[in-house]
């Protein structure tokens, strides 16, 4: 049974978010780096830095929270894995789903790399639907 690195990073982020941790440390791979760059660019993550520990590299993410009227902090990061190793989901550029009417993003793995749904529609290419983020 293989590892699903995308599901692992989604789980790391979701668990840190539920426990109200400000930072989460995820293992560094090329795929995780590309997904984290998208999260940073789209404003779902506040800061990212690369960290080395015992000859292994990690990405340390600072999660973004918004302050509620009552003074408590509320996260606004929801992630859902779509295509799994056992069931791959592909979509052409015309059928890429819109999350919350365009408020969320879909991360796709295309022949030109990992990108968001908006970028894939602009370049008119489809690919494997990795996850939804809203």
From Swiss-Prot:
GO terms for cellular component: chloroplast; ribonucleoprotein complex; ribosome. It comes from the Eukaryota. One of its GO terms (biological process) is translation. SUPFAM superfamilies: Ribosomal protein S8. Keywords: Chloroplast, Plastid, Ribonucleoprotein, Ribosomal protein, RNA-binding, rRNA-binding. The keyword Plastid applies. It is found in: Plastid, Chloroplast. GO terms for molecular function: rRNA binding; structural constituent of ribosome. The keyword Chloroplast applies. PROSITE patterns: RIBOSOMAL_S8 (PS00053). One of the primary rRNA binding proteins, it binds directly to 16S rRNA central domain where it helps coordinate assembly of the platform of the 30S subunit. Belongs to the universal ribosomal protein uS8 family. Part of the 30S ribosomal subunit. This is Small ribosomal subunit protein uS8c.
